[in-house]
Amino acid sequence: AGEGLSSPFWSLAAPQRF
């Protein structure tokens, strides 16, 4: 959740994880 702010790409990489 918080990491999404630092790594916006993570949201596209694993949206199911968050």
UniProtKB/Swiss-Prot annotation:
A cellular-component GO term for this protein: extracellular region
Keyword Secreted: yes
Record key words, sorted: Amidation, Neuropeptide, Secreted
Disulfides per UniProt: none
GO biological process terms held by the UniProt record: neuropeptide signaling pathway
Function: Modulates the action of morphine.
Designated name of the protein: Morphine-modulating neuropeptide A
PTM sites of type Phenylalanine amide: 18
Species in which this protein is naturally found: Bos taurus (Bovine)
Subcellular location(s) per record: Secreted
